[in-house]
Design a protein with these regions (language model features):
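Membrane helical hairpin/interfacial module
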Residues: 52-104
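Active-site loop segments of alpha/beta catalytic cores
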Residues: 1-52, 56-60, 134-291
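Low-complexity, flexible helical/coil segments
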Residues: 62-69, 114-122, 209-212
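Generic hydrophobic/packing signal
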Residues: 63, 72-74, 78, 119-129, ...
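Alpha-helical structural context
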Residues: 70, 97-114, 157, 182, ...
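A contiguous, low-structure linker/loop signature
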Residues: 84-130
Length: 291
């Protein structure tokens, strides 16, 4: 691939985008290191996700390989070519298991395939979840402490002058903030079927659970921001809640939206627009979210 020609076009497009007159829609890719681990051609050592999550040296090596792969092989409207990377930026990467694990779910590892979390309560034990106060009183404990340990490991490797194919490490990414969303986390804890049913047949419990989850999200975000030297409230805040695609607009507006608003009030000043990531058929929510 002619990186020089590609990058020349990208620089022109970026300049046009800055001026608000881009000649075409820019093509972007959202990617993460699971692309390396899950592909036997890219992961001949068959490093598993369990090894990746638990060993910061392995995590660093995989992320270096991933950033090289993105720069060399995955075409999109960004500057490409490993030689054009100024540095490699590692970050503690716990995929989508962090928040479930924070609240008591066991991580389910599947070799080189994406890990998940196991439902940790059923109809008879779901009230026990609310008795676990550690996510509220010790938001930097448990798996979050492992995340911070990995962060410090990456900082130390940078200070020691670690390089990958001549590229130094940049400042590690500040991971663990944001959220997959209160209702999505509820589905992880008690299962999607139970969560949807309880919105109708045990609404008092679901409101208590969603408030508990939201408070835990707020506590973790504020604690990590303090740890990273950031203000407790940012100018804007973005989050996800993919599982609201299971709900009607009326149910979302009445029962879930108040918790989204609570997170926004607690975690941002509103000086800049916020955003939400949604999967599936979510277009029915858009007008309400914009308002």
């Amino acid at each position: 691939m002619n990186y020089e020609k590609h990058n020349e076009e990208v620089r022109r497009l970026l300049q046009q985008a800055e001026e608000g007159k881009c000649e075409r829609v820019m093509m972007e890719l959202a990617m993460n290191p699971r692309m390396i681990i899950s592909d036997p051609m890219l992961n001949p050592r068959r490093i598993t996700f369990e090894e990746y999550l638990k060993n910061p040296q392995i995590m660093l090596e995989i992320q270096c390989q991933f950033q090289e792969y993105c720069a060399e092989s995955l075409i999109s409207d960004r500057i490409m070519g490993l030689e054009n990377l100024q540095e490699i930026t590692p970050y503690p990467d716990f995929q989508n298991v962090l928040e479930g694990a924070c609240l008591g779910c066991e991580i389910a590892f599947h070799g080189c395939n994406e890990p998940g979390t196991k439902v940790c309560a059923d109809e008879t034990t779901k009230y026990e979840l609310l008795k676990n106060t550690r996510p509220l009183t010790d938001p930097l404990g448990g798996i979050v402490s492992t995340l911070l340990s990995h962060y410090e490991f990456f900082k130390k490797k940078r200070e020691e002058g670690y390089t990958y194919k001549g590229k130094p490490l940049g400042s590690p990414g500040m991971a663990g903030m944001g959220t997959d969303g209160p209702f999505t986390i509820a589905c992880s804890l008690i299962g999607a079927t139970q969560a949807c049913m309880d919105l109708y047949v045990d609404q008092d419990y679901m409101m208590e659970l969603l408030d508990y989850i939201t408070e835990a999200v707020i506590a973790r975000n504020k604690a990590l921001r303090r740890c990273y030297g950031q203000p407790e409230k940012s100018k804007s805040f973005g989050f996800a809640d993919d599982s609201i695609a299971l709900l009607s607009l009326d149910t979302y507006t009445e029962l879930i939206l108040p918790f989204h608003k609570k997170m926004m009030r607690e975690l941002c000043t509103g000086e800049e627009p916020g955003w939400i990531h949604l999967c599936g058929d979510a277009s029915r929510f858009f007008p309400t979210l914009v308002r």
